């Protein structure tokens, strides 16, 4: 073998040695970042169920190891307040209304950096009784895409009102923006009713947009047999209860300070619950097309678990009311 060949082998040895001198976790980290693709998830749920609180605490935990942007898609504009420690963020729709067009908005005016470097945006909504709140979502997402806000991210999280899945609120589902939907619910009838309706919306667009249901998150209201009830609802919807979040006063303590539990009390057991939920979402591969149930099936489920009374109990209650009225 000639000198040139020996020099070539020496060069190879230097390159290999340089690579192996790096810590294995450094190489693994670089490899993961190269191979990773941005995941777009969405949290849907009935108004008042604790959707925004649950999503922000989960994202705060997820942000410990990932680059994330939150896009608030609720007219209340409360999807980012715990990340930013503020009452409400200026919304895209509000600025667009002030200036007459979204084209006069600068990205820095509506995209703020919060806890753990999470990027925060609120789509906003119109004045009560005027226009469609869902249009704010469409305007916001189009604006963010055009301005390059989706670059260099591991996750985008949409926080969406879910009492009704109308055209505007279904936009992240319909247009395939969010590929994974997580429904925040509880053992209360209306929360479960909303969850089933959201599952219907996912089913409608699953074959055209590729959206899938990632699971139900039970944000506990201390209803009897709540975990078992939501597990059964999840089974009937063809999905999983991905996590049961216990009720804790620590959540309210943190909210009073406009903080997530992850930031306010990172070592508290409730913070560990959100970390566990974030870990399950990060590793989740159980993404399904849901199988919504009928209203009759939902009521039967609630009767079986003692949340609703059966027909006999209903009639007895009516008779008792009549007797009390006569007396």
Swiss-Prot record:
ATP binds at residues 45-52. [4Fe-4S] cluster binds at residues 132, 166. The reversible ADP-ribosylation of Arg-135 inactivates the nitrogenase reductase and regulates nitrogenase activity. This is Nitrogenase iron protein. Residues 1-37 are annotated as: PEST-like. Its EC number is 1.18.6.1. Keywords: 4Fe-4S, ADP-ribosylation, ATP-binding, Iron, Iron-sulfur, Metal-binding, Nitrogen fixation, Nucleotide-binding, Oxidoreductase. Its cofactor is [4Fe-4S] cluster. It is an enzyme of class 1 (oxidoreductase). Pfam families: Fer4_NifH. The modification ADP-ribosylarginine is found at residue 135. One of its GO terms (biological process) is nitrogen fixation. It catalyses: N2 + 8 reduced [2Fe-2S]-[ferredoxin] + 16 ATP + 16 H2O = H2 + 8 oxidized [2Fe-2S]-[ferredoxin] + 2 NH4(+) + 16 ADP + 16 phosphate + 6 H(+). The key enzymatic reactions in nitrogen fixation are catalyzed by the nitrogenase complex, which has 2 components: the iron protein and the molybdenum-iron protein. It comes from Crocosphaera subtropica (strain ATCC 51142 / BH68) (Cyanothece sp. (strain ATCC 51142)). It comes from the Bacteria. Belongs to the NifH/BchL/ChlL family.
């Amino acid at each position: 073998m000639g000198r040139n060949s020996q020099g070539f082998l020496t060069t190879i040895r230097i390159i290999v040695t340089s690579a192996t001198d790096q810590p294995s976790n450094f190489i693994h980290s670089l490899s993961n970042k190269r191979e990773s693709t941005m995941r777009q998830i969405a949290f849907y749920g009935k108004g008042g169920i604790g959707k925004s609180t649950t999503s922000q605490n989960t994202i705060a935990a997820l942000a410990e190891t990932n680059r994330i942007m939150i896009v608030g898609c609720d007219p209340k504009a409360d999807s980012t307040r715990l990340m930013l420690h503020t009452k409400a963020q200026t919304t895209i729709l509000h600025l667009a209304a002030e200036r007459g067009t979204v084209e006069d908005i600068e990205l820095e005016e509506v995209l703020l950096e919060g806890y753990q470097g999470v990027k925060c945006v609120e789509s906003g909504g119109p004045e009560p009784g005027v226009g469609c709140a869902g249009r704010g979502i469409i305007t916001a997402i189009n604006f963010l895409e055009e301005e390059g806000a989706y670059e260099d991210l591991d996750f985008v999280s949409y926080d969406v009102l879910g009492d009704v899945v109308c055209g505007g609120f279904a936009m992240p589902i319909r247009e395939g923006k969010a590929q994974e939907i997580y429904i925040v619910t509880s053992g209360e009838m209306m929360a479960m009713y909303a969850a089933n309706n959201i599952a219907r919306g996912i089913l409608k667009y699953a074959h055209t947009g590729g959206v899938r249901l990632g699971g139900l998150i039970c944000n506990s209201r201390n209803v009897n047999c709540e975990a078992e009830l939501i597990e059964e609802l999840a089974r009937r919807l063809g999905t999983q209860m991905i996590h049961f979040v216990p009720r804790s006063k620590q959540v309210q303590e943190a909210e009073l300070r406009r903080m997530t539990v992850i930031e306010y009390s990172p070592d508290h057991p409730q913070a560990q619950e959100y970390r566990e939920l974030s870990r399950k979402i990060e590793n989740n591969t159980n993404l399904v097309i849901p199988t919504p149930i009928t209203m009759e099936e939902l009521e039967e489920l609630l009767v079986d678990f003692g949340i609703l009374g059966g027909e006999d109990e209903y009639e007895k209650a009516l008779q008792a009311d009549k007797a009390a009225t006569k007396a």
